[in-house]
């Protein structure tokens, strides 16, 4: 079974929009890839059904149409190859193919952590185009991402319309589509798991939450922007100290297949330290962080240290604030605190990349659905992130990145004010 779709996207000047950092080629999806895509779409619909959101045939028809459209849009971009795919991901899969598949886990392959490499090793056994399989993995977690955002928002509203809105908003959110279907990146994996971790942590299932957080961290180091929320949950007595033992246990369990394949234990568990050493020396990599304002910095090493110190200061200040007001902590306060940390930590850190605000994009969207008066927050986050995506994919700036940084600074201020209102209530406003 083969269905060919030739993709050409043009801008108003007549040139190819994505001509710089990736090439769109003919999409020739074989039977396996097509079936997997259909299964993912079916899963997206089933999750809504089992969550009790499809009560009438009309609901099923409308949601089925939206799911079909979401996956059709993704399929159109499956033929796009970025330099990340050409120079790294495709070569890693080929390495597994040429060195015994899972047996090649015994050595060092790429700089992603091993849980993601398990999937690449699996793909080396299949006859389907590696590009499609990599993107299908990411789009599978797009579904889990939408589900996690919906569940998190569901702690604050029971409105079926609003829950369906956040579900489909995530599936159609520009950075979500670009990240998985165009770029072939895996940010949806760690963020979907992190959102579920927050949901379980805030809804009385701390063990599940900690396990999900460990899985998130096992896939991507950037989960550290979200992990501090569990300290807030500890302060709020939603988790206990012993629950933190689940984190290393689950993490080591995920490392075990690679270790059993012969990969050295120390190399396996310290991979992230190697990643931090290779992050690069530039203060900013197309990120809407505070360093987007930096111009002609004379001592970049000092600036990097100051940024790191500022990020840690913010984090510990939030911890102290919540400890001081621990008797006033509600789910609303935790949601505000989570947004402060997820936006503020990467905003202040040096060496941030274009995709590092992906979690902020989605958490702010769930926040806005929970509290519709703050509808502008995800729009500002998305604006900031898209500037970075455009800079990478087009190799030129649509606007200078400091405009995105200004947008995120405003989001951070609003999150601080919102959280202050929750922790120091005169009369708590009802947002839902």
Where are these regions (language model features)?
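Transmembrane helical bundles and short interhelical boundary loops of multi-pass, membrane-embedded
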Residues: 29-39, 48-49, 77, 269-286, ...
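Transmembrane signal-anchor helices characteristic of membrane glycosylation enzymes that use polyprenol
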Residues: 31-87, 172-174, 248-263, 343
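Loop-to-helix entry region of an early transmembrane alpha helix in multi-pass inner-membrane enzymes
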Residues: 32-33, 114, 128-147, 300-312
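Aromatic/glycine/proline-enriched transmembrane-helix motif characteristic
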Residues: 47-53, 59, 155, 275-348
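Extracytoplasmic catalytic/substrate-binding loops of multi-pass membrane glycan-assembly enzymes
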Residues: 78-92, 107-119, 279-290
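Membrane-embedded helix bundles of polyisoprenyl
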Residues: 162-199, 210-222, 247, 339, ...
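Perimembrane helix-loop-helix junctions
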Residues: 225-249
């Amino acid at each position: 079974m083969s269905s060919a779709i030739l993709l050409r996207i043009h801008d108003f000047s007549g040139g190819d929009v994505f001509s710089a950092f990736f090439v769109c080629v003919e999409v020739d999806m074989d039977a396996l890839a097509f079936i997997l895509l259909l299964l993912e779409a079916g899963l997206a619909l089933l999750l809504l059904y089992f969550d009790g959101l499809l009560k009438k045939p009309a609901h099923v028809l409308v949601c089925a149409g939206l799911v079909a459209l979401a996956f059709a849009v993704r399929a159109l971009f499956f033929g796009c190859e970025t330099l990340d795919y050409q120079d790294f991901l495709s070569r890693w899969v080929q390495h597994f193919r040429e060195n015994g598949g899972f047996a090649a886990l015994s050595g060092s392959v790429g700089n992603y952590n091993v849980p993601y490499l398990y999937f690449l090793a699996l793909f080396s056994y299949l006859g389907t185009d590696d590009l499609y399989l990599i993107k299908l993995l990411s789009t599978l977690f797009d579904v889990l991402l939408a589900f996690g955002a919906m569940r998190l928002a569901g702690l604050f509203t029971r409105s079926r319309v609003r829950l369906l809105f956040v579900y489909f908003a995530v599936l159609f959110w520009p950075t979500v589509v670009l990240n998985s279907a165009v770029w072939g990146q895996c940010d949806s994996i760690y963020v979907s798991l992190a959102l579920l971790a927050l949901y379980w942590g805030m809804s009385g299932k701390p063990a599940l939450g900690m396990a999900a957080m460990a899985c998130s961290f096992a896939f991507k180091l950037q989960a550290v922007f979200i992990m501090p929320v569990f300290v807030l949950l500890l302060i709020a007595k939603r988790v206990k100290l012993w629950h933190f033992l689940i984190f290393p246990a689950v993490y080591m369990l995920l490392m075990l297949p690679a270790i059993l394949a012969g990969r050295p234990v120390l190399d396996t568990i310290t991979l992230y330290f190697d990643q931090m050493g290779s992050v690069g020396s530039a203060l900013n990599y197309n990120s809407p962080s505070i360093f987007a304002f930096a111009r002609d910095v004379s001592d970049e090493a000092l600036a990097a240290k100051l940024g790191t110190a500022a990020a840690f200061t913010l984090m510990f200040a939030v911890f102290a604030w919540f400890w001081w007001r621990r008797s006033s902590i509600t789910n609303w306060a935790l949601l505000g605190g989570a947004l402060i940390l997820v936006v503020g930590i990467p905003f202040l850190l040096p060496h941030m990349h274009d995709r590092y605000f992906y979690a902020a994009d989605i958490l702010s969207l769930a926040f806005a659905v929970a509290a519709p008066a703050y509808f502008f927050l995800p729009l500002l986050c998305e604006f900031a992130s898209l500037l970075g995506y455009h800079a990478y994919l087009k190799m030129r700036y649509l606007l200078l990145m400091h405009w995105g940084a200004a947008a995120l600074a405003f989001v951070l201020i609003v999150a601080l004010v919102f959280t202050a209102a929750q922790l120091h209530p005169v009369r708590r406003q009802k947002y839902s």
